[in-house]
């Protein structure tokens, strides 16, 4: 008889669960809702894929990213799991075929964008079949306090309420403050959930901030990259134009770099991603479109060429460094111009015709401004950066870590004082 360990070994090829995974699997199999906040690279997908293969009915995985769905479904199918996805990358004929097969019981796991839950055809299928579990990936998208608020996530609860039998619900995210966790519990109507909040601390990561005028950033960036020699790294930029310019700058110095952003055609994006994953290029220069679901353990540095919009985004992106547990460096370059750029995007979001009421959009903008304020504080604080980050996410931390630019600077100043 199959059990979590036999599925883990047979389907996924692992001998044992990582810390925290097995308890989540057990709770979901026992019918208890779960809210899991686990850092990038902690193996969240195993936590719901294993029970999905042991529960009697079908599991629906709600995911916001087309590329992530494709990658995860591709890996499952390769492992012999009957899985499929439903999103806008499919033609109408492909969607109809997928739904017909779903009604015929072809699939064990179905990934879908939250908007797909509202399709009449999808709702008919869900009401005809036994839906044992609904998994919500990137669950922070349900909260206006989260960094990627998606109004369509708010309708997941309504979808669950239309099902003949309430499924167990698993909500997963890499970063969630107390505000966001409250929203996830409330908006998904989680019933007495088992909660896992893994420590956000990544002791192997060095955190650094550097103030630099826009005209100085290319020089500062080259200094940082050249110190890394042949190490693999990711450079995040806030605009596609900046990605292209930075990629050309690095290539002009003989550095093997590739670009990744939404304006590149899918084939180029896939090729550049594979070149980076298989070490054919040293550096990926990207917008925040790059990284979700990418597991490259040997990334030795992540540089943010521009300040991100909030600490949730920053920590998730910086956390793609050092997944092998070896030392890695995370450096943020910032200037006043970065803040103006982020405010421009916040205003643009306010003006967008996305069907949201004006008061909801105004509240979302207010919360985005609040998150930007903390991001700016992080960029300019003289405090220990690790302590600042951990406190923001609700953890207590030692006042000094000794492994960030501010701690190193104060140590250096103390040494100089002693020598005088």
Question: What are the roles of these predicted feature ranges?
Answer:
Residues 2-11, 15-19, 23-45, 52-55, ...:
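Helicase motor core with emphasis on the C-terminal RecA-like subdomain
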